[in-house]
């Protein structure tokens, strides 16, 4: 169901469903319920507005149809999306190839005359020129003390010698997303910075080494978190990773509470980080393809500490 503004685009993109262009949502729902004698309706949970949900429930009540409450459409969709087909994996790899190229490009662009915002724009422009239909999400570029904000917004702050620069970015190809984070240094770096970087790198490598089919997702999270917690407990507050596909954040997650069993064909990020408030932060992120024995790293960019 969509309105006139998106009708043509929906018909081009949606191949296995009938697209209904409505003028009045309630009337279109009513016609569908009546024509197909529908008695149970699954509602999308995360993005459906309360106003839209009220319309569905009101019309369902009029036609003795019941909105199903014990599950949601999201639940079914996320399970269907979790294991990627060969074509989906091909699209994700194509998006990551553009992302890797953007990282190589940006290393020669960064200097003390550039701001975080300018670096973010250059990454985005380069990816679009390389064939990305759009960027995967709002590009993150944070440096120096801004780096402790794990999802900080690029600012007008200029790069300074001694800064860590964290860049989190991705591309979209044929609707499929990529996601990568790299932290690089500009000029000289302190021993404390090097120690944090190596800890994050070791944590990420341990998690990737652990990732395989047939294990709980939280086992991968634990592999990374245990290494960070030895000397930096409390500085790694987000999950170790999330699935990627048609959306940038999909299910399942490499998270402490996620006991979902991994399956071959899942594409999930591995992105531990350490964030020292008011000082700096480090995050390293790759995407991995879960396989029967181990995983394939889809990210090609170097991740040893680069000092520009």
PLM-predicted stretches and their roles:
Residues 1-308:
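Active-site neighborhoods and metal-handling regions in enzymes and metal-associated proteins
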